[in-house]
Amino acid sequence: MRLKCTISYDGHLFNGYQVQPGKRTVQDELEKALAVLHKSKDRIPVVSSGRTDSGVHAAGQVIHFDTPLSIPAERWPYALNALLPDDIAVKQAEIADDGFHARFSAVKKEYRYFVYTEKHPDVFKRHYAYHFSYRLNVQDMREAAKHLIGTHDFTSFCAAKTEVQDKVRTIYELDWTETADGLQMRITGSGFLYNMVRIIAGTLLDAGIGKISPDEVKSMLEAKDREAAGRTAPGHGLYLWNVYYDN
């Protein structure tokens, strides 16, 4: 039986999602909990919709795994949450078709990036939003964002060490909204390259402080050079918010 689960996690104390020797990761905690539940000495492989970096959070990460256990789907969150640490939670579980794949069946992903613009740092927000106290022109940020919507080669907006050859991606939605303590960026797309969302956020913040003009974003895309784009915003402001599937 293949099970599809939606999970959330606080990325602050994790070295990212993917298993790394000697480091605490989300995947490692999930697979350890499943091994206990299955009374197995071997790991139960877990597949996710995608990896998140160190410090990055998830409100709606999706995973799948295969199991011989006959636990009803609605009981799986209770069973796993009893074994998982407090910074990971299974929100929902459902039986999936054998052909379902958490990564390859996804048709769209949504990320959000949170910025708080208060004058002084807030110790209670320091792991969950980016402190950016400069005055921001939100309209310029929105104008700059328009150049990124659509299908483009995002070479300039991914880490230089990215090994993926095809860097063409489609951005469906990209906007900034004002919150009680700052701003929130919402972005949806067909998929994202390594550090792509963080570089987009950092570049649009540069537009907000007047470091670049909104129209310069177009030339950044055309340059196909990481050095042409703006800063990489820190990981702790980023959340994998939702993963969308056809069914």
UniProtKB/Swiss-Prot annotation:
Reaction catalysed by this enzyme: uridine(38/39/40) in tRNA = pseudouridine(38/39/40) in tRNA
Q: Which GO terms describe its biological process?
A: tRNA pseudouridine synthesis
The record, for Gene3D superfamilies, names: Pseudouridine synthase I, catalytic domain, C-terminal subdomain, Pseudouridine synthase I, catalytic domain, N-terminal subdomain
EC assignment: the record states: 5.4.99.12
Q: Highest taxon of the source? A: Bacteria
Q: Which UniProt keywords apply?
A: Isomerase, tRNA processing
Does the UniProt entry include the keyword Metal-binding?
no
Which residues are annotated as active site? D53
Q: Which residues are listed for substrate binding in this entry?
A: Y111
Q: How does it assemble?
A: Homodimer.
- HAMAP family the UniProt entry points to: TruA (MF_00171)
NCBIfam families this protein is in? Answer: hisT_truA
What family, per the record?
Answer: Belongs to the tRNA pseudouridine synthase TruA family.
Summarizing the function annotation, the protein's role is: Formation of pseudouridine at positions 38, 39 and 40 in the anticodon stem and loop of transfer RNAs.
Q: Which PANTHER family match?
A: PSEUDOURIDYLATE SYNTHASE, TRNA PSEUDOURIDINE SYNTHASE-LIKE 1
| Protein name as it appears in the record | tRNA pseudouridine synthase A
Species, as recorded: Bacillus subtilis (strain 168)
